[in-house]
Amino acid sequence: MTTAKTAQKQGQARRDQLRGQVLSIVEQQLRSGKTFAEINVADVVAEAGISRSTFYAYFVDKSTLLRIWYDEFTQVVLGAVQAWWSLDDTATSQDVRAALERIMDAYRAHPELLAATHEAIGNDHGVREAVDHAMRRYIDGLRTHIEAGQANGFIDPSLPAAETAYWLQWMAERGLHRMLREEPESSQKLLAEAYAAIVWNSLYAPARRSGG
């Protein structure tokens, strides 16, 4: 490995380590009741034991930090959601419930950062673009699954695939981040079961009843 590549690798490792450290502090402050807008860089770098210049050497501002995290989170969700989008004509309602649980597990890991992301949508163009891009990918993926299911007889053929995917994905996006941040565990279980029932009865159950 050349000296330049070694330095680049070390720089990326330092950036990743610093990002994890700073994000942990931001999450702690969010849990304490602060909004993302109320968190200032001076307090974060002081707690992290780094200088402001070090922070800004890696991140343009705190919103950049949030966008980088959200892009990584999107990849985690896209990995988890494959358990749903890979279901076929043998899938049961319990299979759907288990697949959706994997997605919910991804959201459960960082509810405060998700809430901060949605808070920032209103005033940060970059965050808004990151969320919109992620949602387009989620919607396109579900649309493809619906179309495949319709072609193979296990999803209701009367549904408009693109529009159905749009509604199901936006319902889940808003519902999941609010549920995991605001509802007690007992309510979360009931809400998760209701989510799975909505998906099953909207997409798969009609095809089963008609013998598809």
Locate the predicted segments by residue.
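Amphipathic alpha-helical packing segments from all-alpha helical-bundle domains
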Residues: 79-82, 105-109, 125-152, 162-166, ...
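Hydrophobic alpha-helical connector segments
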Residues: 68, 82-109, 161, 168, ...
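Helix-turn-helix
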Residues: 21, 32-64, 68
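Hydrophobic/aromatic-rich alpha-helical bundle segments in the mid-to-C-terminal region
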Residues: 128, 150-197, 206-212
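Generic hydrophobic, amphipathic alpha-helix propensity
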Residues: 14-29, 44, 69-77, 142
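Helical hydrophobic small-molecule/effector-binding pocket
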Residues: 93-118, 140-144, 169, 204-209
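Short helix-capping/turn signature of helix-turn-helix
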Residues: 59, 119-123
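N-terminal intrinsically disordered/low-complexity leader segments
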Residues: 1-17, 158, 181, 207-212
